[in-house]
A protein has these predicted regions:
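N-terminal secretion-targeting helices of virulence/extracellular proteins
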Residues: 1-172, 749, 753-757
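Non-catalytic all-alpha helical scaffold/repeat segments
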Residues: 176-667, 671-751
């Protein structure tokens, strides 16, 4: 890879001069051609005849063509050199800006790229006393390091492409000038990348490393990615990746396996760029249609006769789709087509299963996260989980029937047979949450225990896709700034709450005899946390509470039941509690500090603000006790240690209030309250559930109730300090908030407990 000193100190002037010199040649060749034609050819015409003249004029005609070709070739080389200079100059400028930024932030960048934090504050007591300082410095260092690496990768790819273009013998053995020369670095890199991909599993480790460097450097470049995939074609794309993953899986600790792991990510991100219709150029609808057709075809992945597995194209593609954010125009039809195929034949992905005949796994997902890739639905749903626009369109749109070849069947219906006769698929949410649907173990391992574990990957990916569909961001987005909810998203949340909070919904996620969708409980909790305003409206019936965009119009009974089921998951419990406390704190601040014309006393407004959140907290307390003592799906320590993402959910809960209310508030609520609320949430979840006897007696919420009272009083204290209230008034309002929290928490817990009869 190009080094930092080399790029930083490189004198690019001679390259610019060379480009200018080559750029001047076409005009000179044109002048020579005109002079040759005038002084030689035209001079001889009409004065020389016979066989020798005929042969001479033919030779001179070829010479004239050579002048033309020489001019064309010189112009193209000039453009290539100019492009190289432009790119190198841009990378050099970016590198120098990063080095200046590093110095300004007290980082030292060594010549080998190693970065050392030399901030003098590390030697002061402030550093050790402030954990936030260490986090801030690490984030800056990581960002700087990744950006430096990116610039060097881009410069290296451009350097190698320029070298390959200039070393190419464009004239061939004839030594004649011609026009077969590269005109851009993208064209060179496309040829290099497709040539390696065409070798499939015959490519060397070094060649795969080069392919990865080219793809990674150009993954955001639509001209390169479109050219690469267009030249490779859908069939070869899937064929070469299928054979590479099958080969690499035989040696999971080898360099080759690591190269294929990296290739999976680079192919995914590059495909997302190439299929984005908002970018120019992009792959055509015909290319996309052919990819869908290939998805329903089987691929031979090994010449070994003892290797019987022939995956469908979608089983191969599923591994690539796990990486990248895809446009709905590309990804939604793939998801719809795959459902049509699976509904027509629920055993399609396992009808040629090698399980029971092979000792090793087979994978299209060498990254190893979320299964082996044997079930293509897992990969497709993961792709939707990173593509919120496509996920929303898929889950909120109509069910569309497709022919096997990937084209739409205008008059067709999607009907599925689970052994009790065919029935219509009501919606894609209905399809994936049907209790009779069998989730394919996302592994080819013949070990039955491993296969059983692998059935969790599909439902987990379904949860990820629903998170993206309802939130407008990828499921693994770590920020707090959230887009407002659309009407379609809010409607989908209503359907989800009705589904899992309605009859039979609890059995899907917490059933004692097996819960097929238990792995998606954390995602359902995240959805509730993202819709905390709607949730608090649902449990309280107060439609005046602020929501973030369109309202989900949640039913009270369904909302309570939904929270009770989902809250039994430690991760969901944390997200809901964190968002609830932040949202409630925002409501308390609004009640105490917001401008209002109402004559309702502030104490009553505070009680009203505390009530919905305390009700949610009560349901959560009882749900936690149920998980520990009833369904026995978790231990107290599972809830107590689950605090990594508290800050994210506190920030989102705060934003749901501050970003949605129209009544002015004093200052920036989200800014001043997040740190205090985060501390309060951590204290709230670090508790013990009731004893089993207390749980059986219906008193499993006492510890949680104390925490709800404390957090309500904390909210008043923060809002009071923020609004400049005197100590006595704050104390009185804290008492009011505490009483309301105690009563509402008890009501919420008892309502949840009553569901058990």
């Amino acid at each position: 890879m190009v080094s930092i000193p080399y790029l930083d100190k490189a004198d690019l002037g001679p390259l610019a001069d060379a480009a200018a010199s080559w750029g001047a040649l076409p005009a000179k060749y044109d002048a020579l051609q005109r002079e040759f034609e005038q002084r030689v050819i035209n001079h001889l015409k009409g004065h020389w005849e016979g066989d020798a003249a005929t042969a001479a004029f033919a030779t001179m005609s070829r010479a004239r063509t050579e002048y033309e070709n020489a001019a064309t070739e010189a112009g193209r080389i000039a453009k290539l050199l100019a492009d190289a200079h432009t790119e190198f100059a841009a990378f050099q400028k970016q590198l120098r800006a990063l080095l200046d930024e590093a110095r300004a932030d007290s980082f030292h960048v060594a010549e080998d790229g190693a970065i050392k934090d030399v901030d003098s504050r590390w030697d002061s007591p402030t550093a050790s006393a402030s954990p936030g300082f260490a986090t801030e410095r690490k984030e800056k260092l990581d960002s700087l390091s990744s950006r430096l690496t990116r610039v060097l990768e881009l410069a290296t790819a451009a350097d190698e492409a320029a070298s390959a273009a200039l070393e190419r013998d464009a004239n061939g053995e004839s030594r004649s000038f011609n026009t077969s020369v590269y005109t851009s670095l993208d064209a060179v890199e496309i040829d290099q990348a497709t040539a390696i991909a065409a070798k499939g599993d015959q490519a060397t480790d070094a060649e795969l490393d080069k392919l990865n460097r080219i793809l990674h450097a150009n993954s955001k470049d639509s001209e390169f990615t479109t050219g690469f995939y267009d030249k490779l074609g859908p069939h070869k794309t899937l064929d070469f990746y299928a054979n590479l993953t099958a080969q690499a899986d035989e040696e999971p600790d080898s360099r080759r396996f690591k190269e294929v792991q990296e290739l999976q990510k680079n192919l995914g991100h590059s495909l997302a760029t190439a299929t984005d219709p908002d970018k120019q150029p992009h792959l055509s609808d015909a290319w996309n249609a052919e990819l869908r057709a290939q998805g329903a075809q089987k691929f031979t992945v090994s010449d070994n006769p003892g290797y019987p597995y022939q995956p469908y194209g979608y089983q191969v593609l599923g591994g690539i789709l796990r990486y990248g954010e895809y446009d709905s125009h590309f990804l939604t039809p793939i998801a719809q087509h795959a459902v049509s195929l699976e509904a027509e034949n629920p055993d399609i992905w396992i009808e040629n299963s090698p399980r029971g005949s092979l000792n090793e796994d087979i994978t299209s997902n060498p990254s190893g996260k979320g299964g082996d890739g044997f079930d293509p639905m897992t990969g497709i749903l993961e792709g939707l989980g990173h593509s919120p626009g496509a996920a929303e369109d898929f889950f909120t749109g109509d069910v569309v029937a497709y022919h096997r070849d990937g084209t739409v069947d205008p008059g067709g219906d999607v009907r599925v047979d689970h052994g009790d006769g065919k029935k219509d698929v009501g919606s894609y949410l209905d399809y994936f949450t049907d209790p009779d649907r069998d989730w394919v173990p996302d592994t080819a391992d013949r070990d039955l225990e491993e296969s059983a574990k692998a059935t969790q990957h599909g439902p987990d990916a379904l949860g990820h896709a629903l998170e993206a569909a309802t939130s407008g961001v990828a499921y693994d987005y770590e920020g707090s700034d959230m887009p407002k909810h659309s009407q379609a998203q809010a409607g989908l949340v209503n359907d989800i709450v009705e589904k899992f909070g309605g009859q039979g919904g609890g059995e899907l996620v917490n059933g004692k005899d097996g819960a097929p969708l238990e792995p998606m409980r954390d995602s359902l909790g995240h959805i509730a946390a993202n819709y905390m305003g709607d949730v608090q409206r649902g449990v309280s019936g107060d439609d005046n509470l602020p929501v973030h965009g369109a309202s989900a119009n949640l039913d009270r009974a369904a909302t309570q039941a939904f929270l009770a089921e989902v809250g039994q998951d430690p991760d969901a419990y944390q997200a809901i509690n964190a968002s609830q406390q932040a949202y409630t704190t925002g409501l308390v601040d609004r009640a105490m500090n917001g401008e209002t014309d109402t004559r309702v006393p502030v104490s009553d407004r505070v009680a009203s603000a505390v009530h919905p959140g305390a009700t949610v907290a009560g349901i959560m307390s009882e749900a936690r006790a149920d998980a520990v003592w009833d369904t026995k799906r978790a231990e107290d320590e599972d809830f107590n240690k689950n605090n990594e993402d508290v800050g994210k959910w506190v920030g989102r809960g705060a934003g749901l209030v501050t970003g949605a209310i129209k009544v002015p508030v004093v200052g920036d609520v989200a800014g001043w309250m997040i740190e205090d609320v985060q501390s309060s949430v951590l204290e709230s979840i670090a508790q013990d559930s009731s004893t089993e006897a207390e749980h059986e007696a219906g008193r499993g919420y006492s510890d949680g109730q104390e925490q709800a009272v404390r957090s309500a009083r904390d909210a008043v204290r923060q809002a009071g300090a923020h609004g400049g209230y005197d100590a006595d008034t704050i104390g009185d309002l804290q008492d009011t908030a505490g009483r309301e929290a105690q009563q509402s928490h008890a009501a919420g817990a008892k309502a949840e407990d009553a569901r058990h009869g």
